[in-house]
Structures are given as structure tokens and as C-alpha cells.
Swiss-Prot record:
The keyword Lyase applies. GO terms for cellular component: cytosol. It comes from Shewanella sp. (strain MR-4). Keywords: Lyase, Magnesium, Manganese, Metal-binding, Riboflavin biosynthesis. This is 3,4-dihydroxy-2-butanone 4-phosphate synthase. The lineage of its organism: Bacteria, Pseudomonadati, Pseudomonadota, Gammaproteobacteria, Alteromonadales. Disulfide bonds: none annotated. InterPro entries: DHBP_synth_RibB-like_a/b_dom, DHBP_synthase_RibB. GO terms for molecular function: 3,4-dihydroxy-2-butanone-4-phosphate synthase activity; magnesium ion binding; manganese ion binding. The keyword Magnesium applies.
Length: 217
């Protein structure tokens, strides 16, 4: 990761803190993973404060595969099985079956319908019977231990929500360029500047979490 491009956003700790504050304010953040991994940037919002306008941005500016990151215990509570029995994807992305709210949606495709589905899934009293399967929202199961266990956007999203003091559920989608190619760090930084969103990396979250552990120790 070319850290020099990120220097205007401060140190790793400062970048994470800016991201946490944005999430607390109901705004989006951009998270880039390692160059030797997916080398992609995801636009991430807190699920609990997600708006229809933010969902529309995810659909319009990103890949369109809008995912709901959930901790393992929530996936189990909703009885969401893995999308496939044997996950052979390159990075082991833990998709579950896709979902739709049973109440309050039409076809499930619109921004408003997808927000309704997400709010139904993350409700404190949500039950498996509240969700239809399949649907147009794609849950991702985060590994316990977060980015210290797996350096993925799914784990980074849950870590950020927990560090921000929010409900551990976040919505993400990969940022794409207008021509449909994947946005890399320079394009992600430009996107962040255009939309006044902080940019940080998975490595930043690792550094931040390790610093917290060191302070506790």
C-alpha cells in the first residue's frame, strides 16, 4: 500500500479515528485492503443509520453487490447458512444465503427495499422468520477476532462499528470506476475528496487495534 498517498489523511491512528467519527455521524468511510490481497476499496456505512440516499450511492457508485456484514453470533441467530457448502473463493469470503425482508418491500431491488431488509435483519429482536431467502441483500459473516484474524473488508467493517460504539453491523460495496473497472487507491482517494469521506486501510485498523491492546497490556 502506497502510504505516501494516504499521508494527507494523517497517521494510521488518526485515519481510523477520523473514520470512527464519520461513522458515528452517520457518514460513509472508504476502506482499502492490502495491495497483495484484493487491492480494492469499499464504501462502508453503519447499518443502523443507513439511509435510502446512502443505499442509492452504493448501488450507483459501486459494484451493485451490496453486502451486510454481520458477526458470527448474529448470523447464527438468524439461521443464515453459508451460500455454498464448500467455499472455494480465493479469499474465503463468507457469503451466506441472500436475504429479503418479508414485510415492507415490493421486489426487494430498490434502494428503499434493500434498506428495509437490512433494518429487519439487524433489529435486536430479529428472528429467522423475518427474512425471506433468497433476496437482494448479501450477508457476510465476519470471522471472530476481526482483522487480527482475517484482513478482510468484512472483518474491518465489524471492527470499525464496534470501535465506534455502534451496533456491530455494516453495509459495504466495492467502489468501481465509471467504466466498470475496480477503483484502486488513487481513485478511492479522489472519491473520498469528492464526497468528503475519510480514507483508511485494513492495515490502519490492525495498527489501531494492536495499539489498544498494547495500552491495555
Amino acid at each position: 500500500m502506497n502510504q505516501s498517498l494516504l499521508a494527507p489523511f494523517g497517521t494510521a491512528i488518526e485515519r481510523v479515528e477520523a473514520g470512527l467519527e464519520a461513522l458515528r455521524q452517520g457518514q460513509g468511510v472508504l476502506v482499502v485492503d492490502d495491495e497483495d490481497r484484493e487491492n480494492e476499496g469499499d464504501l462502508i456505512f453503519a447499518a443502523e443509520s443507513l439511509t435510502n440516499a446512502q443505499m442509492a450511492m452504493l448501488i450507483r457508485e459501486c459494484s451493485g453487490i451490496v453486502c451486510l456484514c454481520l458477526p458470527d453470533e448474529k448470523v447464527k441467530a438468524l439461521e443464515l447458512p453459508p451460500m455454498v457448502e464448500n467455499n472455494s473463493s480465493q479469499y474465503g469470503t463468507a457469503f451466506t444465503v441472500s436475504i429479503e425482508a418479508k414485510v415492507g418491500v415490493t421486489t426487494g431491488v430498490s434502494a428503499a427495499d434493500r434498506v428495509t431488509t437490512i433494518k429487519a435483519a439487524i433489529a435486536d429482536n430479529a428472528k429467522p422468520s423475518d427474512l425471506a431467502r433468497p433476496g437482494h441483500v448479501y450477508p457476510l459473516r465476519a470471522q471472530p477476532g476481526g482483522v487480527l484474524t482475517r484482513r478482510g473488508h468484512t472483518e474491518g467493517t465489524i471492527d470499525l462499528m464496534q470501535l465506534a460504539g455502534l451496533k456491530p453491523a455494516g453495509v459495504l460495496c466495492e467502489v468501481t470506476n465509471p467504466d466498470g473497472t475496480m477503483a484502486r487507491l488513487p481513485e478511492i482517494i479522489a472519491f473520498g475528496a469528492a464526497h468528503n469521506m475519510p480514507v483508511l486501510t485494513i492495515e490502519d485498523i490492525v495498527v489501531y487495534r494492536k495499539s489498544l491492546l498494547a495500552n491495555v497490556g
